[in-house]
Swiss-Prot record:
GO terms for molecular function: ATP binding; glucose-1-phosphate adenylyltransferase activity. GO terms for cellular component: chloroplast; glucose-1-phosphate adenylyltransferase complex. It catalyses: alpha-D-glucose 1-phosphate + ATP + H(+) = ADP-alpha-D-glucose + diphosphate. Pfam families: LbH_GLGC (PF25247), NTP_transferase (PF00483). Pathway: Glycan biosynthesis; starch biosynthesis. This is Probable glucose-1-phosphate adenylyltransferase large subunit, chloroplastic.
Amino acid sequence: MDSSYSFALGTSSSILPKLSFRNVENRFYGEKNNNNGLCKRFGSDLGSKKFRNQKFKHGVVYAVATSDNPKKAMTVKTSMFERRKVDPQNVAAIILGGGNGAKLFPLTMRAATPAVPVGGCYRLIDIPMSNCINSCINKIFVLTQFNSASLNRHLARTYFGNGINFGGGFVEVLAATQTPGEAGKKWFQGTADAVRKFLWVFEDAKNRNIENILILSGDHLYRMNYMDFVQSHVDSNADITLSCAPVSESRASNFGLVKIDRGGRVIHFSEKPTGVDLKSMQTDTTMLGLSHQEATDSPYIASMGVYCFKTEALLNLLTRQYPSSNDFGSEVIPAAIRDHDVQGYIFRDYWEDIGTIKTFYEANLALVEERPKFEFYDPETPFYTSPRFLPPTKAEKCRMVDSIISHGCFLRECSVQRSIIGERSRLDYGVELQDTLMLGADYYQTESEIASLLAEGKVPIGIGKDTKIRKCIIDKNAKIGKNVIIMNKGDVQEADRPEEGFYIRSGITVIVEKATIQDGTVI
């Protein structure tokens, strides 16, 4: 273009045209020379060999830049560079909700992982769904397979006709299917196989304008503007972009790990490595903008399981290059690195994979901290869930410390410390809850029904008188009698007691859905 800008360059700021990493506040830590014309022109005009940080937004530079060792102020004239802004209408999201949820068992005994409650009143599926809505992405596919009834019901109640505006978009549930002759052979075999089975949807006329496809997980807790992610993907002209986060050595083997060069390109991917393989994935994360101490604490880069593909690249990978590969993390991505441009996008905000009982429990209880790293309260980017039209919680002479109490609960002269109480929960006189996650109930029992059950020696939904519970997850519609003690005093780490209505995972007692714990039971 013929137009140009003039910039007054002071004596204390500078520019870094080396990296393509961006943070969540929509500003660049830097940009690659070979992909960003604005940085190329600045670098050429300044003639400097070493640069520091510079901020950019769409279309124009709003920070001031100088060389490292300026002798005087100067003016630089550079030609205008316009950055192509991605249209959300050309982006589709695929949310993976079909896993068997083995690591979250027994919470997934009757429900798909994305349908598991979180934060008192939400479901895990609400996280990627809300992030899509807040990012103006309104073409959303949800892939389901195991125990999908409650997930389908929640999606229908929450996102179909309940006031959430999708414009020309949609939310479409794609359930695992079989055709005659395929019985027992064609269930989803992995994340990539699940997407492959439904690539035909992008042949529909309404989806032919889709240029980029997001692949999202249904068991993570985070707040993310996906359009920042997609914009970075388009800016770098990558075939695939992986959203990544720095992690500590103690957590590293739980994730797919990547190595990224200084141009932002992923040069190595290893799925959940251990031992020597884990050590080989260690990297200097100061290049991501971490301080020396932060880099020491988090010397690995984990893939978040959030991917952005060029539509053409995704179709080619799954149907032509790797038609028998079933999983993105362990098969497709590592293979694609060899002959495709795979870029890394560094996400520096809170992110937690809550696909195990331990991480699920810890991530939930972290919400009650005085200054939590993540919270659902944000008027600009709210999290949506099903409208249940419940009355406010009623608490009679209760003591509550660092806790979250959902709508529609009845609490009578009880103590609740560092716990989350789900919707429609009932806590009777003398109950003591500590470090406990209670998922609530799907329906109420009236006072007369409760009285009748107690008179018959039965246990109503909720927690009975003088019961004491610590370090526990109580699934929906559980019935816990009076004078019960659930504390795992023996510090048992793993146990299966389905006939008694509970399991123990990582030292956390899990009372299963609809279980009945009789009066006086000690666990």
